[in-house]
């Protein structure tokens, strides 16, 4: 059966209250406003063949897209370890309204769950850690499709270095405008407030938050890290891991935590291969701090260069990403008010 047909049938069953998620009425959830063809085109998956492991959805950060960020690191390494892997690319390199970008995550999770018949392990970096939480908060069908969520350097409570929180950024925003997503990164934004109101970790999902002292973009890290969820509450389904608590001499910044850091990868791998969130000792403990290559056996896949070259005409045809310049934070969608 063709995957699209399989997805359509599974979605129909799900909407009718049948299938693996009994009781979830998709029709009662916030309606996805994005063109379904765009949502479909944004998702790329390997065949769903490894039934003993959860399929993994990789979610990129701001200024990049799924293939650029993951096709040379996490994706081949996870495939090598027997995982089915998907990447999703939300619009305009993450510059637009994150409420819109979250619809791409909702659709991806529903589709992967329906086509694979398994719950999904999601790994996201930066905005790709923050924004999918919006999908999990407001769409029960998205929550029901996920068993693990690994968040790498996610500004979960906003960041002190948001462009709108400094005089120059505020001036530029009020005159020329700033990308919509930039306003939503601020600690006092309506987006952050709505996201963290009530349960920060909804659903039967294990959450692993990994962050670093040397993150120049997601601040503060101490005394209470903005990347952490339910910090200090001892929730058994949540692990908040500061890399320097594991490896005191490890220097990892905002970019490398989501691209090349070995300890981060091993902790993420531990989370998605065991029940519960990541466990530092089980993942290797002090051994994660030894002189190791940035990622285990990392090497550019032979076809990586050709894949990137194949993207060029598509990028040229699509033109420059929309900047989504606005002079104020986008209003909250009605379902979040």
Label each region the model flagged.
Residues 203-337:
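C-terminal catalytic-base region of ester-bond hydrolases, centering on the histidine
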Residues 1-7:
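Bacterial N-terminal signal peptides that target proteins for export
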Residues 14-17:
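C-terminal motif of bacterial Sec signal peptides marking the signal peptidase cleavage site
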Residues 48-52, 79-80, 114-116, 123, ...:
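Extracellular/periplasmic catalytic domains that process cell-envelope and extracellular macromolecules
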């Amino acid at each position: 059966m063709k995957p699209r047909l399989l997805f359509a049938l599974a979605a129909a069953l799900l909407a009718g209250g049948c299938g693996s998620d009994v009781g979830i009425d998709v029709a009662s959830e916030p309606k996805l406003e994005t063109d379904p063809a765009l949502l479909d085109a944004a998702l790329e998956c390997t065949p769903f063949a490894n039934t003993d492991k959860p399929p993994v959805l990789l979610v990129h950060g701001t200024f990049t897209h799924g293939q650029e960020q993951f096709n040379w690191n996490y994706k081949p390494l996870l495939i090598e370890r027997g995982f089915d892997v998907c990447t999703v690319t939300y619009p305009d390199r993450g510059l637009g309204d994150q409420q819109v970008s979250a619809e791409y995550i909702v659709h991806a999770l529903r589709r992967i769950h329906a086509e694979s018949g398994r719950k999904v392990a999601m790994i996201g970096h930066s905005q790709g850690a923050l924004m999918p939480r919006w999908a999990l908060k407001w769409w029960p069908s998205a929550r029901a499709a996920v068993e693990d969520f690994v968040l790498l350097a996610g500004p979960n409570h906003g960041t002190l270095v948001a462009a709108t929180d400094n005089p120059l950024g505020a001036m530029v925003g009020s005159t020329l405008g700033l990308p919509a997503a930039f306003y939503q990164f601020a600690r006092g934004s309506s987006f952050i407030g709505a996201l963290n109101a009530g349960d920060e970790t909804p659903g039967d999902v294990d959450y692993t938050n990994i962050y670093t002292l040397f993150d120049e973009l997601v601040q503060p890290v101490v005394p209470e890290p903005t990347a952490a969820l339910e910090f200090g509450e001892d929730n058994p389904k949540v692990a908040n891991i500061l890399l320097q608590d594991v490896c005191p001499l490890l220097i990892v910044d905002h970019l490398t935590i989501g691209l090349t850091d070995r300890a981060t990868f091993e902790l993420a791998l531990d989370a998605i291969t065991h029940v519960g969130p990541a466990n530092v000792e089980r993942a290797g403990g002090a051994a994660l701090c030894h002189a190791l290559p940035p990622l285990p056996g990392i090497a550019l896949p032979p076809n990586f260069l050709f894949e990137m070259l194949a993207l060029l005409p598509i990028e040229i045809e699509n033109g420059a990403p929309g900047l989504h310049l606005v002079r104020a934070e986008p209003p909250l969608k009605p379902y979040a008010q």
